[in-house]
Amino acid sequence: EIAQCLVGSEMCIRDSFMAAGLILSAAANLIIGIAGFLNGDGYIGNAIFFLTFIILWGINGWAQSMGGPPGIVSLSRWYPLSTRGTYYGFFSASHNLGEFFSFLFVGAIVGLCGWHWGFAGSAVAGAIGIAIIIALLHDSPESKGLPPIEVLTGEEKSEEHKARSTRKMQRTAVRNPLVWMLALSSACMYVARYAVNGWGVLFLQEVKGFTLVEASQIVSVNALLGIFGAVCCGWLTDRFLHGRRNVLAFIVGLINTAALCLFFFSGSGMSINILSMVLFGTTIGILICFLGGLMAIDIVPREATGATIGIVGLTSYIGAGMQDIISGRLLDAHKVMIGSETHYNFTPATLFWIAASTLSFLLVLFVSRKQQGKEHDNRYCLLYTSDAADDLI
């Protein structure tokens, strides 16, 4: 993740970098579909196909990580600070929209033609995306013969940043404690996010007595509301809070934690549990947008946005992975066997999830930038790091 972001920041052809990733992803999907058609019967044929699938799916996942960093860096190049949040909100919601249309598009193809054609259909969708990237995505205003965005909008770029190379700014961002504090806040938020996504259905079944279908319907509400939260959050801070996103992130984090408590400690009524997921889904969409990217690119120079996104992204997914391990061990340590049935005590895991959510919104208070009019003071980029020290690294 960090390597892709560093490369995506340094390259002057971010559109080509993103297109290359999508080409690899589309090719992997197409080959999997073709391999499915050619797969022979028997143990050896199935083993070969399985190995092929594992390799290509790994390539697919790696290639898809080449999409986010160039997109975020391009956003920071093309849009001024005063409207960056608004456009980043739409960008953040694109992941949810992509999943939604994937279910409709690929699901329909698989239902009509079989799973092999589902991969082929995904490859076609990727080809369309490649054409859009090549035709419409451009690296920066300068790449199209325009002045930098600072000149176009009247923003001032500090002399400190003018004197530093992209690589030096990236190294400064990596040493910035505020970047790591934001990354830790995002990791804690991901603990709460994947706690609900991963364990919410089982919790509703075990603790509140819902059926599998009912529990799945309740938890699915939060995914849909995440789109609404992501789209609205950037515009709200641009319009009413003048870019002070940590203030809104703190308030939203507080509501998110309250929604978790409502979900885990309320009764078994359908309405109250749906309400908790409405609140949780909306707020988690906002927090993913803020902590997962927008605040990260606010506190560093444009030249270091890719490296910062890489740090936050990697730390967030480490948090999600640790959540699975810790939650699984807590649930396993407190399970009770009644006859042949296993029942889980969710109390220790629930306290862990709520504690992580609380720590997330407390940490975010310390991460901010100062904006006065159209000037962006990046004093949080740790100017104590001298150029001489940079040259020694």
Stretches with model-predicted labels:
Residues 1-8, 384-393:
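Single conserved hydrophobic/aromatic residue that forms the stacking wall/gate
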Residues 10-22, 239-253:
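Cytoplasmic membrane-interface "Motif A"-like loop-to-helix N-cap segments
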Residues 23-45, 255-268:
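C-terminal ends and interior cores of transmembrane alpha-helices
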Residues 28, 44-65, 272-287:
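Hydrophobic core of transmembrane alpha-helices in multi-pass small-molecule transporters
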Residues 58-93:
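Cytoplasmic helix-loop-helix junction between adjacent transmembrane helices
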Residues 96-139:
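Helix-loop-helix hairpin linking two adjacent transmembrane segments in secondary transporters
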Residues 177-223, 323-324:
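Extracytoplasmic gate region of multi-pass secondary transporters
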Residues 246-291:
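C-terminal transmembrane helical hairpin of 12-TM major facilitator-type secondary transporters
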